[in-house]
Regions:
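Bacterial N-terminal signal peptides
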Residues: 10-20
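N-terminal leader/linker segments that initiate helical-solenoid repeat arrays
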Residues: 21-68, 72-79, 111, 516-529
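Terminal, low-structured helical/coil segments at or just beyond the last alpha-helical repeat
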Residues: 27-33, 464-529
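Short helix-capping/linker turns of helical repeat alpha-solenoids
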Residues: 37, 67-70, 83-85, 104-107, ...
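Hydrophobic face of amphipathic alpha-helices that form TPR/SEL1-like repeat modules
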Residues: 42-49, 76-83, 110-119, 147-155, ...
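Structural signature of tandem alpha-helical TPR/SEL1-like repeats
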Residues: 52-57, 88-97, 121-132, 159-169, ...
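Canonical positions in the second alpha-helix
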Residues: 64-65, 100-101, 135-136, 172-173, ...
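Alpha-helical adaptor scaffolds
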Residues: 395-429
Length: 529
């Protein structure tokens, strides 16, 4: 665990990093607002008109009904203000209408109100969401319990993420028949949400089996995949193939991906793997399409056929797959000085991948804008895309953005505080160059108080993460440490690797933000661009 005296870049940025959930499970992502549900009774006409896209007319029809206390109409007006459709966007007015609808026991209003309150930076408002959801859970434990589980796992209702309470609420929701909560439990025990100490492959398998038995086709494919390629202690080829067959019969074609993955990575039979990927590709399964493209591009078990591979990537890209767009962009932009046609074409594919929320693509697009290869450097666009990738948890983007803030570029002055925080966030994900950069700042006392003990620990960690140039810094700092400090530095390194929070010290200075736990890095890492 690293504690640094760097100010937060912004509440939004820190929140995005300090809650390392790999995928949203109930709470809406970003500002996403789904369409309201179908209404019955007096508000039906207003709701139908609104869902047809005539938002202003829907608001007009709902207003007099809302004044009479109609819960459906109140909910619709709340949604309109939250989304800015048909009226002004206003979180305050959305909350006002949702509260009134919630008082009339409107379930969706309770949940939308809770989403807004949970996103608040005020603890009091988040606690209001907790109370509303716990009350709703008495009648609707499935949905309310699922949302509460995620809120606790994200640390929105407690000072730190609380996996025990998350599991409690998900189990309660699951017992009420909520298949999504069953799947969340399966993923949780698989370690997808962090907390490796609570990982339990057998419990994960139990929950995947439960969801599959209840008819969830995605769970059928996931279960089959785990039985074929998961932890060796739980593998069962016969049962795995049976579940994948059921998934395919139910038109869940990701099962072909699981079969291909099993043949490729467990059985080491590349021809059999390609056959499964081809079947999935023919059924329209995008991931199988990408795997098949890889086989032809790399000549794995077949004669190398770049044209066929690229054609498959283009087909996947046309279907909107961001990874396919990114791979084509990489092909077109690979040259040091790509031709104009390739540059423009690559830019288009890269932009599509970035708009598809692929952090790697967002990072590369940001760098492309900053490079000036498009004719002139666009600092604003470059920083915007790097920031978006950084908010998505991309360690390379965090490091790149930190470097920009540390050095400063035209149109963007230096900001050591931002740089330090971003380096820390990237280092917490095991990023070697960021770890070294952070060690350098800490040693030199740039933006923070010089701390040779912490600097030695960080520099040593950077060496372990493949940064050979960190050796010189380790040696230099070591010459400044006395015996007592060397012992403290070793302890600091051990603490960083363990992920435990350091012991608190009496310090009259303003408390520094606590970054996520440092993860031990591999002995070697790939070179960073």
């Amino acid at each position: 665990m690293i504690r640094m005296h760097f100010r937060l870049i912004s509440t939004l940025l820190f929140t995005a990093f300090s809650i390392p959930l790999q995928a949203a499970v109930s709470l809406p992502a970003g500002n996403a607002v789904s369409m309201p549900t179908t209404a019955e009774g007096p508000a039906k006409a207003a709701m139908d008109v609104f869902k047809e896209g005539r938002h202003a007319k829907g608001v007009e029809l709902a207003t007099p009904l809302a004044e009479q206390g109609n819960a459906e109409a109140l909910y619709l007006l709340g949604f309109a203000h939250e989304s800015g459709q048909g009226t002004e966007a206003s979180k305050e007015k959305a909350l006002e209408y949702y509260r009134k609808a919630a008082a009339g026991k409107h379930k969706d209003a309770i949940y939308r109100m809770s989403f807004i309150l949970l996103a608040s930076d005020k603890e009091e408002e988040r606690d209001q969401a907790r109370q509303a959801l716990e009350t709703a859970a008495k009648d609707d434990p499935a949905v309310a319990g699922r949302i509460l589980g995620e809120a606790y796992l994200r640390g929105l209702l407690t000072p730190a993420p609380d996996p025990d309470k998350a599991v409690f609420w998900w189990e309660r929701a699951a017992s009420d028949g909520d298949i999504l909560s069953v799947l969340l439990l399966a993923r949780f025990y698989e370690g997808q949400f962090g907390f490796p100490e609570l990982k339990d492959p057998k419990l994960s398998l139990v929950n995947y089996t439960k969801a599959a038995t209840l008819g969830n086709t995605g769970a059928m494919a996931a279960l089959g995949s785990r039985l074929l390629s998961g932890d060796e202690k739980i593998r069962d080829e016969k049962k795995g193939r049976e579940w994948l067959k059921k998934a395919i019969e139910a038109k869940e074609y990701s099962a072909y991906l699981a079969l291909g993955d099993y043949e490729e990575n467990v059985k080491k039979d590349l021809k059999a793997a390609l056959a499964e990927y081809e079947r999935g590709k023919d059924a329209g399964q995008i991931d199988c399409m990408l795997r098949t493209a890889d086989f032809y591009l790399e000549g794995k078990s077949v004669e190398k056929d770049a044209d066929r591979g690229i054609a498959l990537l283009r087909k996947a890209a046309e279907a909107g797959n961001p990874i396919a767009n990114f791979r084509i962009a990489a092909q077109l932009l690979a040259a040091e000085k790509p031709e104009v046609a390739n540059l423009l074409g690559g830019y288009g594919y890269l932009l599509a991948a970035a708009n598809g929320n692929l952090p790697d693509a967002q990072n590369e697009l940001g760098l492309l804008y900053l490079s000036g290869k498009m004719g002139v450097a666009d600092t604003s666009a470059g920083i915007a895309w790097l920031t978006r990738a950084a908010q998505g948890g991309n360690a390379q983007a965090q490091n790149n953005l930190a470097t920009v803030y540390e050095r400063g570029i035209t149109g963007l002055p230096r900001n050591i505080e931002n740089a330090g925080q971003l380096y820390a966030l990237a280092a917490n994900q095991g990023h070697g160059p960021a770890t070294l950069a952070l060690a350098r700042l800490v040693y030199q006392g740039v933006g923070t108080k010089s701390d040779p003990i912490k600097a030695w620990a960080l520099a040593t960690l950077a060496v372990e993460r493949g940064q050979k140039e960190a050796d010189a810094l380790v040696t230099e700092v070591a010459t400044k440490l006395d015996e007592k400090q060397r012992v403290a530095a070793l302890k600091e390194l051990e603490t960083m690797k363990s992920g435990k929070a350091p012991e608190k010290k009496d310090d009259a200075s303003v408390p520094a933000p606590t970054a996520p736990a440092i993860a031990p890095g591999p002995k070697k890492v790939k070179p960073v661009k």
